[in-house]
């Protein structure tokens, strides 16, 4: 088995370490990649390779494996049955106003959430 991973300091790697690996370390022999796209390409082009990847980077070039018998679907991630999900947060300095509020209203509205889904991510609403 060829292990592929994101580089140290990657948010994707940090989430995988925390949620899956816990105190175990990723092998020193792992092929390290600087982006999720490069990680996907490595798995797609390397026989016997395995890696972890953000939902939005999944495509038909790689096979997504179930965890604990649960498929990695939008529904399973949203309802909490898929065991590896990481929330992301939006932060502002104080109460959002002006263009910041307009952006948040847009991205959380129907049109913005449709864009989120079209990009391969899971909408929050």
Question: Locations of the language-model features?
Answer:
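Exported/periplasmic ABC-transporter solute-binding proteins
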Residues: 1-125
């Amino acid at each position: 088995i060829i292990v592929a991973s994101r580089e140290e300091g990657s948010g994707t790697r940090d989430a995988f370490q925390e949620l899956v690996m816990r105190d175990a370390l990723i092998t020193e022999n792992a092929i390290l990649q600087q982006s999720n796209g490069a990680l996907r390409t490595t798995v797609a082009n390397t026989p016997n390779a395995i890696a972890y990847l953000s939902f939005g980077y999944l495509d038909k070039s790689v096979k997504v494996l179930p965890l604990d018998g649960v498929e990695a679907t939008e529904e399973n991630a949203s309802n909490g049955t898929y065991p590896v999900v990481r929330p992301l947060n939006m932060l502002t300095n104080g109460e959002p106003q002006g263009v910041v509020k307009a952006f948040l209203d847009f991205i959380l509205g129907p049109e913005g959430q449709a864009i989120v889904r079209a990009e391969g991510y899971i909408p929050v609403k």
